[in-house]
Curated annotation (Swiss-Prot):
Gene Ontology biological process terms from the UniProt entry: ribosomal small subunit biogenesis; translation
Name of encoding gene: rpsD
Protein name: Small ribosomal subunit protein uS4
Summary of subunit composition and partner proteins: Part of the 30S ribosomal subunit. Contacts protein S5. The interaction surface between S4 and S5 is involved in control of translational fidelity.
The entry's keywords: Ribonucleoprotein, Ribosomal protein, RNA-binding, rRNA-binding
Keyword Ribosomal protein found: yes
Organism: Cronobacter sakazakii (strain ATCC BAA-894)
A molecular-function term among this protein's GO annotations: rRNA binding
InterPro entries the record matches: Ribosomal_uS4 (IPR022801), Ribosomal_uS4_bac-type (IPR005709), Ribosomal_uS4_CS (IPR018079), Ribosomal_uS4_N (IPR001912), S4_RNA-bd (IPR002942), S4_RNA-bd_sf (IPR036986)
Keyword Nucleotide-binding (UniProt): no
Disulfide-bonded cysteines: none
Reported function: One of the primary rRNA binding proteins, it binds directly to 16S rRNA where it nucleates assembly of the body of the 30S subunit. With S5 and S12 plays an important role in translational accuracy.
């Protein structure tokens, strides 16, 4: 499945919630009719079956993190193999992706922009360039912006936006040096309550 390259707002309208795919700290404005389906008039959303609700939640989370279907399924399989709660393991794996960590640290205004920084070799982990967006960052790893990329206006703009967002407690960031430490894996209480990972587990458990 190819990565979606169309309007970001359309995805948020399809899911009926702000997926935070666009830069900025404000939620998408109500005039954008976030609860209305895509299209000129917004087709009325049919009542979903239990399966439909589970599928919708999976699609929402997959789009938030910008992960393709096969990748997402593999994350679920790995989460199921790990000890502990499968749903929480899944979210921890998604949060541990390098592109997501770069976004959380404020070096990219969106996860898509953070992914681009990684693929363009602008990001280092423990002093070594890593250009794989799905690379799993481990506790105590140091993630930094390469020296030649620190002058990029988009990185500076992203850091300014990040100052207005709530800072993740599992990360420690030095905005001046453009580097941060992944102190620990996030706990479930650290993450959005708007995600219902139990629905995803139910979907894949069938």
């Amino acid at each position: 499945m190819a990565r979606y390259l169309g309007p970001k707002l359309k995805l948020s309208r399809r899911e009926g919630t702000d997926l935070f795919l666009k830069s900025g700290v404000r939620a998408i404005d109500t005039k954008c009719k976030i609860e209305q389906a895509p299209g000129q008039h917004g087709a009325r959303k049919p009542r979903l079956s239990d399966y439909g609700v589970q599928l919708r939640e999976k699609q929402k989370v997959r789009r938030i993190y910008g992960v393709l279907e096969r990748q997402f399924r593999n994350y679920y399989k790995e989460a199921a193999r790990l000890k502990g709660n499968t749903g929480e393991n899944l979210l921890a794996l998604l949060e541990g992706r390098l592109d997501n960590v770069v976004y959380r640290m404020g070096f990219g205004a969106t996860r898509a922009e953070a992914r681009q920084l990684v693929s363009h070799k602008a990001i280092m982990v423990n002093g070594r360039v890593v250009n794989i967006a799905s690379y799993q960052v481990s506790p105590n790893d140091v993630v930094s912006v390469r020296e030649k990329a620190k002058k990029q206006s988009r990185v500076k703009a992203a850091l300014e936006l990040a100052e207005q967002r709530e800072k993740p407690t599992w990360l420690e960031v030095d905005a001046g040096k453009m580097e941060g430490t992944f102190k620990r894996k996030p706990e479930r209480t650290d993450l959005s309550a708007d995600i219902n990972e139990h629905l995803i587990v139910e979907l894949y458990s069938k």
